[in-house]
């Protein structure tokens, strides 16, 4: 009888954890703003439909959620990370290029969108020596972790945010290699860079929806390729990226993402010359119709111009 009771309690608890709930999120946007606002969530990107008032445009979206998940709010080309959780609605007001939050889910989202403190900027990848960049990176990420623990936020969010900060750190680490200075054919990176990158190239399919996960893996693969090949041999670097990706990762979503991103970037920059080895890899691993159509259109345009 005791064992039956324990099983019953576990079933009830599991059902409560998996309970789905529709939650509504509201958005207030200045009438003077002309940039569109998109919500990127679960690999879909939805353009918000605003209704104009006297001084604000208003929009809302209701989502069926069973827990907390990351999403991105795009204002034009600028992304803002948000946290969507069942039973934790919020209202977001856009002011001075920032989202400000009110409601049950405001604490986590206010944390995600605060701008105080030291930041990593793109120019840091090449403006300062790699040794100094690495020190700054560790300093910034450690401070962000301190702030996270001090904020006393939802434990479910904290667990995911620790992962996100790790991917953010890895992406910056790799970007310092990819976009760093090259002097006399040699890259300005610390001797331990290759080993550090090898440690963090690990696949984690459970992190697919965490912002920065797929971007960090892509950047790490690119950085390793630049360290193994001559950094100015773009064709060799790309082949290294593609071969490492298809031989290392089992999540086809991740493989498709990296292959598509790097091949498209290469063709946009250098055209279709010397893609005989590249094209079959793209065809084998990229299957989303919209991605294939965009690639075909780009190749056809380049062939007409050549």
Positions of predicted regions on the chain:
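Bacterial Sec-dependent N-terminal signal peptides
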Residues: 1-24
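Generic structural signal for short, flexible, solvent-exposed coil/loop and linker residues
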Residues: 3-6, 26-28, 154, 280
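N-terminal non-cleavable signal-anchor helices
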Residues: 8-13, 38, 52, 109, ...
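Intrinsic disorder/low-complexity detector
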Residues: 5-8, 40, 45, 304
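Oxidative protein folding and maturation machinery
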Residues: 96-306
């Amino acid at each position: 009888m005791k064992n039956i009771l324990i099983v019953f309690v576990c079933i009830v608890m599991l059902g409560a954890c998996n309970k789905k709930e529709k939650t509504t999120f509201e958005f207030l946007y200045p009438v003077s703003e002309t940039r569109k606002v998109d919500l990127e969530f679960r690999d879909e990107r939805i353009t918000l439909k605003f209704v104009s008032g006297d001084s604000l445009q208003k929009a809302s979206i209701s989502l069926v959620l069973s827990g907390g998940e990351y999403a991105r709010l795009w204002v034009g080309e600028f992304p803002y990370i948000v946290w969507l959780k069942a039973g934790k609605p919020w209202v977001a007001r856009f002011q001075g290029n920032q989202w400000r939050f009110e409601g049950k889910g405001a604490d986590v989202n206010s944390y995600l969108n605060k701008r105080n403190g030291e930041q990593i900027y793109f120019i840091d990848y090449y403006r300062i020596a790699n040794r100094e960049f690495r020190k700054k990176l560790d300093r910034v990420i450690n401070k962000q972790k301190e702030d996270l623990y001090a904020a006393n936020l939802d434990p479910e969010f904290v667990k995911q945010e620790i992962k996100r900060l790790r991917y953010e750190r890895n992406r910056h680490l790799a970007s310092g290699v990819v976009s760093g200075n090259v002097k006399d054919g040699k890259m300005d990176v610390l001797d331990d860079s290759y080993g550090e990158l090898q440690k963090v190239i690990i696949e984690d399919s459970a992190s697919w929806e965490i912002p920065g996960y797929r971007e960090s893996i892509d950047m790490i693969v690119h950085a390793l390729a630049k360290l193994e090949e001559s950094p100015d041999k773009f064709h060799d670097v790309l082949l290294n990226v593609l071969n490492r990706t298809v031989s290392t990762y089992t999540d086809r979503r991740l493989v498709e993402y990296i292959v598509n991103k790097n091949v498209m970037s290469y063709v946009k920059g250098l055209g279709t010359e010397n893609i005989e080895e590249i094209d079959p890899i793209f065809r084998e691993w990229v299957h989303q119709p919209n991605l294939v159509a965009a690639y075909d259109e780009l190749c056809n345009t380049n062939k007409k111009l050549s």
